[in-house]
UniProtKB/Swiss-Prot annotation:
GO terms for cellular component: ribonucleoprotein complex; ribosome. InterPro entries: Ribosomal_uS10 (IPR001848), Ribosomal_uS10_CS (IPR018268), Ribosomal_uS10_dom (IPR027486), Ribosomal_uS10_dom_sf (IPR036838). The keyword Cytoplasm does not apply. Involved in the binding of tRNA to the ribosomes. This is Small ribosomal subunit protein uS10. HAMAP family: Ribosomal_uS10. It comes from the Bacteria. Belongs to the universal ribosomal protein uS10 family.
Length: 101
């Protein structure tokens, strides 16, 4: 086959993303394919500002932050063995995986 596979991982917890990327790298290396990465992509931060009081005190506000972490993996010289190993791989439920062939 020998095609390039690009895997993007996204999660709100950076530990989950790192562990998932490490798991994928170990699995792919056992099949004999070449892996580049994990490459950390920029962190997206969303900040929400909310009034603390429902009625008065406009000056009193509270801010909440939601950060999403991303990693990028490229797999070269993959075989059918590599693809089968990736399909059978169990990843945590908080990680979004996007695969492009």
């Amino acid at each position: 086959m020998s095609q390039k596979i690009r895997i993007k991982l996204k999660s709100y917890d950076h530990n989950l993303v790192d562990k998932s990327a490490e798991k994928i790298v170990k699995t792919v290396k056992t099949t004999g394919a070449v892996v580049t990465g994990p490459i950390p992509l920029p962190t997206n931060k969303k900040i929400f500002t909310v009034l603390r009081s429902p009625h008065v005190n406009k000056k009193s506000r509270e801010q909440f932050e939601l950060s999403s972490y991303k990693r990028l993996l490229d797999i070269y010289s993959s075989s059918s063995k590599t693809i089968d190993a990736l399909m059978k791989l169990e990843l945590p439920s908080g990680v979004e995986v996007e695969i492009k062939v």
